């Protein structure tokens, strides 16, 4: 199979695995499935973030355009935009965050924590983590959507502000899906490899997949630079990187490695950290 066809197959499998977008019929037959193919598709996680980010940006912009301009409009747009991303992904990453919070919050013992993380029920720590994550995300997005970020020469340009929040959402979803791949590179997989949702990712991620993820992220960051200034991007990416390092250190200390839930939790934390970095740099 030629490289372009292989690239498309890997990307579509990543879309099928990490979103609710249907890949069915002849297309699904063409894409196929194997643990090796899914493992190779890891490099396309940031590419999946493009789809999620575009959906989030479209919903945010549509709500702002339809509703009257009030102080609460950005908040409504942020809530519905976040809800749209949860529907698109099936809450895949949010589920990981809840499981990690329940496991690490429910027991100091490594084995017991891993056992709790396998329980599909949401406990008190998981519920609190989900609530704080969703509140934090929507609050930051509402703030970013309500601040005038237009350059002085443009004045109060509503269209520029729309491009700004759209670029923020797109970049946040892409960067936050690229960084967790470094956990696969740096830490061993400690989940139940036989049944874990991250089974195909249990082996070390290849340098080729990391390169693909870097290319996806670099292209989006370059395009985002048309709406976000360089300083804001650097600060936001730095916040996400610090969040990744903190999560990685936590997993290494408490679990001696990572699970699929850890990857989802890290995506959520890195995304929130990205928006926080943008807010700080305003």
UniProtKB/Swiss-Prot annotation:
It is an enzyme of class 2 (transferase). It is found in: Cell inner membrane. Its EC number is 2.7.8.26. It comes from the Bacteria. Pfam families: CobS. One of its GO terms (cellular component) is plasma membrane. One of its GO terms (biological process) is cobalamin biosynthetic process. InterPro entries: CobS. The keyword Amino-acid biosynthesis does not apply. Pathway: Cofactor biosynthesis; adenosylcobalamin biosynthesis; adenosylcobalamin from cob(II)yrinate a,c-diamide: step 7/7. One of its GO terms (molecular function) is adenosylcobinamide-GDP ribazoletransferase activity. It is a multi-pass membrane protein. The chain crosses the membrane at residues 47-67, 72-92, 124-144, 167-187, 208-228, 231-251. Keywords: Cell inner membrane, Cell membrane, Cobalamin biosynthesis, Magnesium, Membrane, Transferase, Transmembrane, Transmembrane helix. Its cofactor is Mg(2+). It catalyses: alpha-ribazole + adenosylcob(III)inamide-GDP = adenosylcob(III)alamin + GMP + H(+); alpha-ribazole 5'-phosphate + adenosylcob(III)inamide-GDP = adenosylcob(III)alamin 5'-phosphate + GMP + H(+). Belongs to the CobS family. Joins adenosylcobinamide-GDP and alpha-ribazole to generate adenosylcobalamin (Ado-cobalamin). Also synthesizes adenosylcobalamin 5'-phosphate from adenosylcobinamide-GDP and alpha-ribazole 5'-phosphate. This is Adenosylcobinamide-GDP ribazoletransferase. It comes from Polaromonas sp. (strain JS666 / ATCC BAA-500).
């Amino acid at each position: 199979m030629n490289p372009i066809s292989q690239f498309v197959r890997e990307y579509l499998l990543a879309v099928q695995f990490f979103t609710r977008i249907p890949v069915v019929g002849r297309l699904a037959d063409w894409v196929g499935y194997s643990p090796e193919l899914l493992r190779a598709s890891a490099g396309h996680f940031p590419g999946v973030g493009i789809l999620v980010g575009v959906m989030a940006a479209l919903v945010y912009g549509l709500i702002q355009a339809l509703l009257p301009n009030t102080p609460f409009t950005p908040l409504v747009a942020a809530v519905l935009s976040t809800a749209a991303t949860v529907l698109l992904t099936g809450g895949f990453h949010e589920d990981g965050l809840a499981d990690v919070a329940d496991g690490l919050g429910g027991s100091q013992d490594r084995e017991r924590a891993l056992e709790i993380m396998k329980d599909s029920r949401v406990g008190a720590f998981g519920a609190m983590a989900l609530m704080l994550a969703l509140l934090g995300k929507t609050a930051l997005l509402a703030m970013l959507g309500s601040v005038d970020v237009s350059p002085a020469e443009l004045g109060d340009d509503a269209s520029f502000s729309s491009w700004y929040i759209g670029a923020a959402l797109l970049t946040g979803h892409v960067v936050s899906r690229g960084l967790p791949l470094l956990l696969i590179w740096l830490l061993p997989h400690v989940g139940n490899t036989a049944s874990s949702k991250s089974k195909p990712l249990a082996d070390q991620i290849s340098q080729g997949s990391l390169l693909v993820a870097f290319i996806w992220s670099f292209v989006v960051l370059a395009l985002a630079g048309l709406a976000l200034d360089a300083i804001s991007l650097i600060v936001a990416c730095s916040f996400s990187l610090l969040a990744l390092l903190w999560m990685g250190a936590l997993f290494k200390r408490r679990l001696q490695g990572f699970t699929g839930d850890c990857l989802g939790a890290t995506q959520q934390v890195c995304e929130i950290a990205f928006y926080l970095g943008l807010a700080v740099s305003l």
